Amino acid sequence: MNPRRKKRLTIILAISAGLAAVIGLVLYALSQNIDLFYTPSELVEGKGPDKIKPEEGQRLRIGGLVVPGSVLRDQQSLKVAFKLVDNGGHLVTVEFDGILPDLFREGQGIVAQGTLKNATTVEAFEVLAKHDENYMPPEVADATNGMHFKPEYTEAQLKGAKQ
């Protein structure tokens, strides 16, 4: 092999190795930021035909309907815990430390983004509520198959909303 071809081959191999390293680093960085969507049933039973369950500490999004009567608020802080359900009937607890969206209601569809604390508990850092009476995020609509609770409010809740 003459020196010119040897130099050209060395340059091509160096560029290929650099490109492979960059692609590997980009894929590794992206894998750390992927948030997979789960329903409560998929979280408990596993997702797909292989019944793959997320690991504790994994980032994920979970969507379902807030179970009426399950919202527990800490009186000393902004911490809130509530349960989600889908048509599979499995319950998952979501813990959130922050201000819930104005449209958050019991019996309504939500999507929470956070990390898996244990098999049936998600520690959320973001909670998204549906937009109006008729809108439901597509993932939640598929998961619940129209299993929508009509919210029932007490007189105290209705008075509090008018003030």
Swiss-Prot record:
Protein topology in the membrane: Single-pass type II membrane protein
Residue ranges, Cytoplasmic side: 1-8
Localization in the cell: Cell inner membrane
Any GO BP: cytochrome complex assembly
Protein residues bound to heme: 131, 135
Cellular compartments per GO CC: plasma membrane
InterPro entries reported for this sequence: CcmE, CcmE-like_sf, NA-bd_OB-fold
Entry's transmembrane regions: 9-29
GO MF annotations in UniProt: heme binding; metal ion binding
Cleavable signal peptide: none
Periplasmic side: 30-163
Transmembrane helix is among the record's keywords: yes
Keyword line: Cell inner membrane, Cell membrane, Cytochrome c-type biogenesis, Heme, Iron, Membrane, Metal-binding, Signal-anchor, Transmembrane, Transmembrane helix
Function, in words: Heme chaperone required for the biogenesis of c-type cytochromes. Transiently binds heme delivered by CcmC and transfers the heme to apo-cytochromes in a process facilitated by CcmF and CcmH.
Family the UniProt entry places it in: Belongs to the CcmE/CycJ family.
Listed name of the protein: Cytochrome c-type biogenesis protein CcmE
Source species: Aeromonas salmonicida (strain A449)
Gene designation: ccmE
